[in-house]
């Protein structure tokens, strides 16, 4: 038993070291510049000393005003998450157009993350079309920052900050997010870009 356990332990230790040295830094900063990673963003003050602090970014050939409506309508039972719909939107295809009736999101509203609305993230603050912060103070925040570039494009920066509660049952979900969040977020940013740039449209009827 001991002879079989040792190789498994060594393999697990090696994998953990490789992830900590290479995988985690990459996934926590995908697409973002060092300056974007280190700069303060709205909502940072709501979660101090986060265990998980991820800043990702993408350049979109559209203005903040053109991108903002796509962010206002996200959520399960709304426009979806523009990510892997089979996983985060009950298999329903995320919207490929702006939905007028979903443009009234405001601080105090909840962005739904489950079909029954019991799971969701509150909108904490909003500065259209520059920034929006979701989350629960002291636990987790999700910030969207839109910075206009001189050429008419936008740097869309997203930051997720959370503190792991190691002795809580929620730690299982936190660790799941640790390893899967990058793939969902990357897909969402790429699909947001394509929609805002007009590369994704509704099929002809």
Regions found by a protein language model. Give the residues of each.
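Short, solvent-exposed secondary-structure boundary/capping segments
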Residues: 130-137, 154
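Short amphipathic, positively biased membrane-proximal segments
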Residues: 1-57, 65-66, 79-81, 145-155, ...
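Beta-strand cores of secreted/periplasmic/IMS beta-sandwich domains, seen most often
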Residues: 57-62, 66-69, 73, 180
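A conserved amphipathic terminal alpha-helix motif
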Residues: 166, 170-205
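Short, solvent-exposed aromatic-acidic interface loops
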Residues: 137-138, 159-165
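Hydrophobic pocket/interface hotspot
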Residues: 67-70, 123, 156-158, 192
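Short beta-edge strand/loop motif at the mouth of beta-sheet-based domains
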Residues: 49, 75-131, 203
């Amino acid at each position: 038993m001991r002879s079989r356990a040792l190789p498994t332990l060594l393999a697990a230790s090696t994998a953990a070291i490789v992830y900590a040295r290479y995988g985690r830094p990459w996934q926590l900063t995908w697409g973002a510049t060092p300056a974007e990673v280190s700069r303060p963003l709205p909502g940072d003050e709501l979660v101090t000393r986060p265990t998980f602090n991820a800043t990702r970014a993408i350049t979109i050939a559209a203005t903040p005003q053109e991108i903002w409506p796509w962010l206002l309508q996200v959520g399960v039972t709304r426009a979806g998450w523009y990510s892997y719909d089979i996983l985060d939107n009950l298999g329903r295809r995320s919207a490929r157009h702006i939905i007028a009736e979903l443009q009234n999101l405001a601080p105090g509203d909840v962005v739904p993350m489950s079909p029954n609305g019991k799971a969701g993230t509150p909108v904490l603050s909003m500065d259209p079309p520059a920034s929006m912060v979701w989350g629960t103070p002291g636990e987790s925040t999700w910030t969207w920052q839109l910075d206009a570039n001189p050429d008419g494009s936008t740097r869309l920066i997203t930051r997720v900050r959370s503190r792991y509660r190691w002795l809580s049952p929620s730690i299982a979900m936190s660790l799941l997010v640790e390893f899967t969040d990058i793939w969902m977020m990357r897909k969402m940013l790429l699909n947001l870009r394509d929609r805002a740039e007009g590369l994704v449209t509704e099929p002809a009827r």
